[in-house]
Amino acid sequence: MRFIILGVLFIAVASMILSNGVMAQSRDFSISEREIVASLAKQLLRVARMGYVPEGDLPRKRNAELINSLLGVPRVMSDAGRR
């Protein structure tokens, strides 16, 4: 799935660059095209680093895990209450 998304984004960027028939230089892009390329590059980098995760589907921590991580409670102590 990850490689399919990267492939689609790569093809989109390549087709945008090659749409004039030859490789365009950066001075040939309008401001809106530069913003589109920058946002696509940002998405590619995010997907390459952590895989495709739709916005809002990030893993959630339970309240106890969040409190323990904020307080710095050692894992041994937090596991003791579960036994």
Curated annotation (Swiss-Prot):
<keyword id="KW-0529">Neurotransmitter</keyword>
<feature type="signal peptide">
    <location>
        <begin position="1"/>
        <end position="24"/>
    </location>
</feature>
<keyword id="KW-0372">Hormone</keyword>
<dbReference type="InterPro" id="IPR009396">
    <property type="entry name" value="Pigment_DH"/>
</dbReference>
<dbReference type="GO" id="GO:0051904">
    <property type="term" value="P:pigment granule transport"/>
</dbReference>
<dbReference type="GO" id="GO:0005615">
    <property type="term" value="C:extracellular space"/>
</dbReference>
<keyword id="KW-0964">Secreted</keyword>
<keyword id="KW-0027">Amidation</keyword>
<dbReference type="GO" id="GO:0009416">
    <property type="term" value="P:response to light stimulus"/>
</dbReference>
<keyword id="KW-0527">Neuropeptide</keyword>
<dbReference type="GO" id="GO:0007268">
    <property type="term" value="P:chemical synaptic transmission"/>
</dbReference>
<dbReference type="GO" id="GO:0045202">
    <property type="term" value="C:synapse"/>
</dbReference>
<dbReference type="Pfam" id="PF06324">
    <property type="entry name" value="Pigment_DH"/>
</dbReference>
<feature type="modified residue" description="Alanine amide">
    <location>
        <position position="80"/>
    </location>
</feature>
<keyword id="KW-0165">Cleavage on pair of basic residues</keyword>
<dbReference type="GO" id="GO:0007218">
    <property type="term" value="P:neuropeptide signaling pathway"/>
</dbReference>
<protein>
    <recommendedName>
        <fullName>Pigment-dispersing hormone peptides</fullName>
    </recommendedName>
</protein>
<dbReference type="GO" id="GO:0005179">
    <property type="term" value="F:hormone activity"/>
</dbReference>
<comment type="function">
    <text>The pigment-dispersing hormone causes the migration of the distal retinal pigment into the proximal end of the pigment chromatophore cells and thus decreases the amount of light entering the retinulas. May also function as a neurotransmitter and/or neuromodulator.</text>
</comment>
<keyword id="KW-0732">Signal</keyword>
<comment type="similarity">
    <text>Belongs to the arthropod PDH family.</text>
</comment>
